[in-house]
From Swiss-Prot:
Entry GO CC: nucleolus; small-subunit processome
Ranges of Basic residues composition bias in the record: 1-12
Protein name stated in the entry: U3 small nucleolar RNA-associated protein 25
Localization terms from the record: Nucleus, Nucleolus
UniProt GO BP: maturation of SSU-rRNA from tricistronic rRNA transcript (SSU-rRNA, 5.8S rRNA, LSU-rRNA)
Biased composition (Basic and acidic residues): 13-35, 363-374
Protein function: DEAD-box RNA helicase-like protein required for pre-18S rRNA processing, specifically at sites A0, A1, and A2.
Stretch forming the signal peptide: none
Subunit structure: Component of the ribosomal small subunit (SSU) processome composed of at least 40 protein subunits and snoRNA U3.
Gene (UniProt): UTP25
Region (Disordered): 1-157, 353-374
Compositionally biased tracts (Acidic residues): 48-78, 111-155
Family: Belongs to the UTP25 family.
Organism superkingdom: Eukaryota
Length: 719
């Protein structure tokens, strides 16, 4: 058996598990918590910013390393909390702690500028790397930006954020409260790309112009200072799919995009370009309005009292405008590298520290599948939340959240700041003015714990408790009126769709510019079933379910009343039955029922099972001492075990990842190869309902899925 992949450790308790859990101590530098709520105009802060100044040394608040990990395991009363603790117990004692001694960092004079105050300490695995919630105001190096000549009133940025009237927003808010049906404004099939997309709009949407088509980013509303670096890094022309994606992004429409294969990363360059474009356009708008106010003030000083004071609303409550949620530090490292390449900054502050905390050359074992190696390569620690700030000539990492332009975080890292057990230390105001939200590699995040994503949404665009020296004369009225969610753009990227992921755009989004859903075309030719390579009996058994809400209960009753009683009678072997259960909560319920209400000899392995018990149960199942074994989807995701001795397979539900279906079926193929099972006697049985249509389509193709879900017959067999 190959050695288990050693994944980075992290904190062993979620905040909701115990309010008494040990928390990382914080090391405070300068801390100025401002509660100023003045509404008078500020004196222009950047008047003297013409000359190139050295960026003021930052005094970052860093979380102190914790040497003693919180113990994993133990009894957990709240089943909801178990979904994340499962992974922690699974990995305890299984991974190595980085014990390298810390070394001080010397400043690099050229490309990378390190702050003198920076100590290049490794962020402990239990720390939230990058966390800096100081309310300090860094000195901006902002001078007048070079004019790209793109101050166009037809620019989607202007149309979406600056030209919408207060009356329009108020009317739309009232309409959307009644939950009207969004209409399909467009539907198209892109045969060459293998996609279809649908575009939905609310009643009376924001109209950001017609479709733009072009093979160059120059055809889109992108700032010229970004076009050259982008074309230098990516000289190839945009294909049709990339063009539609970029056009939708710059028009601030919501996107739910399934990138189909784990190694498809072409979309990342587009959303990074869009995020930078949004940041630079926001900054340029503010600087130009500063100049207008300065001109007005100069005119007033000269005695010109007949000039009307301009009302220039161009900001939110706080500076951060883009939030990017990612599953691991390595994913964050890759996005920051893209930001650096595309932004054209001459200096990058704290880059050496960032590389040390976020990058790693570690790779999973070669025995693991390619998608597993892609997901867990590099530093796969999932505790991080880092601010990124842009000035005229530099990019600054580890900036205070309140002076950052972009915040890149894992959902768990961010949620532990938002809902710190110590209420006095909770911070969420820096999310009050997020205008572009990106959720990338959403399937990986879902396997960690989707509850943390829901926590983040709870605090997005929430009116801040403190106003952090905000200038209310510059804040847009839709921010003040708590209507920012109507204009926030949500970009969601996943390898395959699930109800949780679809829910972000379908239910949590109220974007008045509309929403697009990109769906890959899965046919009987390219579906996962067609790639297995085994002529094995595959039985699909449908059960009746009245609604998605009652589906778990209907599935359980069908299993205990119809499937379980005939389980041993319907198989040709009295051992080697693997029961795969996607949901951990269903797994607990079945495990308890089989233990208390049946006489089956069975074992179970899940996210909480200790390493010794995992090995023992797998060995006893392979030898036939244990007849039945329960196996969870999340355990398979994080460990990718090769289960020996499988002769028959029962899927309590369809796996969310179609690759898992192929891997599970091949467990039987391995037994056939070892001549402990016969291909004609072994079988797979899959339980499903009509609500599983999306997952079913990935397995059998879009031609068969409607038949399996809606026809009279309830059982179908494939080979």
């Amino acid at each position: 058996m190959p050695a288990p992949y050693k994944r980075k450790k992290h904190s062993g308790k979620r905040p909701e598990d115990s309010h008494d859990a040990k928390r990382p101590k914080q090391k405070h530098g300068r801390q100025e918590m401002r509660t100023i709520t003045r509404t008078a105009r500020r004196v222009r802060r950047d008047e003297e910013g013409e000359e190139d100044e050295q960026v003021e040394e930052n005094v970052n608040e860093e979380l102190e390393s914790q040497d003693d990990d919180i113990e994993d395991g133990g009894d957990i009363d709240d089943d909801k909390g178990k979904a994340y603790d499962a992974l922690l117990t699974l990995l305890s004692g299984d991974h190595q702690e980085d014990t390298k001694k810390n070394t001080s960092v010397r400043a690099e004079p050229e490309q990378t500028q390190e702050s003198e105050s920076e100590s290049d300490e490794d962020s402990g695995d239990d720390e939230i790397a990058g966390a800096n919630v100081d309310d300090d105001k860094d000195v901006d190096e902002e001078g007048p930006e070079e004019d790209d000549g793109d101050d166009d009133q037809q620019d989607p940025f202007e149309v979406h954020f600056n030209q919408v009237s207060d009356t329009f927003i108020e009317e739309q808010e009232k309409v959307l409260k009644d939950k009207p049906k969004w209409t399909f404004a467009d539907k198209k099939s892109m045969e060459d790309a293998g996609y279809t997309y649908t575009f939905q709009v609310p009643p009376n949407p924001i109209k950001t112009g017609g479709k733009v088509k072009g093979q160059s980013v120059n055809n889109y509303s992108i700032k010229q200072r970004l076009v050259s670096p982008f074309e230098k890094q990516h000289p190839e022309s945009l294909n049709e799919l990339e063009g539609v994606l970029l056009d939708s992004m710059v028009k601030y429409q919501d996107i739910n995009y399934v990138y189909k294969t784990f190694d498809n990363e072409s979309y990342k360059k587009l959303y990074v370009l869009h995020a930078l474009n949004h940041i630079f356009k926001t900054r340029d708008r503010i600087l130009k309005n500063n100049n207008k106010l300065h001109s007005y003030q100069e005119s007033m000083k000269k005695g010109k009292t007949n000039i009307e004071e301009p009302e220039l609303r161009d900001q939110g409550f706080t500076r951060p405008k883009v939030l990017i949620l990612l599953p691991t530090r390595n994913a964050c490292y890759e996005i920051v590298e893209l930001l650096i390449k595309l932004c054209g900054s001459e200096q990058q502050e704290n880059r050496k520290k960032f590389n040390k905390q976020f990058s790693s050359k570690e790779t999973p074992p070669d025995s693991k599948p390619e998608d597993f190696k892609h997901s867990f390569k590099g530093n796969n620690n999932d505790f991080f939340c880092i601010g990124v700030k842009f000035t005229r000539k530099s990019l600054k990492l580890y900036s205070s959240f309140y002076s950052s332009d972009i915040i890149i975080a894992s959902p768990i890292g961010l949620s532990m700041i938002l809902e710190n057990p110590d209420k006095k230390k909770r911070q969420y105001d820096f999310l009050s003015s997020i205008e572009v939200l990106v959720v990338d590699r959403a399937n990986q995040i879902e396997m960690q714990n989707w509850d943390h994503v829901n926590t983040v949404f709870k605090y997005l665009n929430k009116i801040p408790k403190d106003f952090h020296d905000a200038d209310f004369s510059r804040i847009r009225m839709w921010s003040i009126n708590d209507q920012a969610n109507l204009l926030r753009q949500n970009l969601v990227f996943s390898e395959f769709s699930t109800p949780n992921i679809n829910n972000i755009v379908s239910s949590k989004s109220s974007n008045l510019s509309g929403k697009l859903r990109f769906k890959p075309v899965t046919t009987s030719k390219n579906c996962i079933m067609n790639s297995i390579g085994l002529k094995l009996k595959q039985i699909f058994q449908r059960f009746e379910s009245n609604s998605p809400m009652t589906d778990p209960e209907s599935r359980f009753k069908f299993f205990i009343n119809s499937v379980l009683p005939s389980l041993t009678r319907s198989t040709s072997y009295d051992d080697g039955l693997l029961i795969f259960i996607p949901s951990y909560y269903d797994y607990l319920r079945i495990k308890n029922y089989m233990k208390t209400s049946t006489k089956f000899t069975f074992a179970s392995i899940d996210e909480y099972t200790s390493q010794s018990k995992l090995s023992r149960n797998r060995q006893q199942f392979a030898s036939g001492k244990i007849k039945i074994m329960l196996y969870t989807e999340r355990l398979h995701h994080f460990r990718r075990f090769e289960i020996n001795g499988v002769k028959n397979l029962l899927m309590y539900g369809l796996p969310s990842n179609p690759i898992f279906y192929k891997e599970l079926v091949r467990f039987i193929g391995k037994s056939v190869f070892r001549e402990i099972a016969d291909l004609d006697l072994s079988f797979i049985k899959i339980l499903y309902s009509k609500w599983d249509a999306v997952a079913l389509e990935r397995i059998v193709g879009n031609e068969r899925a409607p038949v399996l879900c809606n026809s009279v017959n309830e059982m179908y067999e494939f080979r």
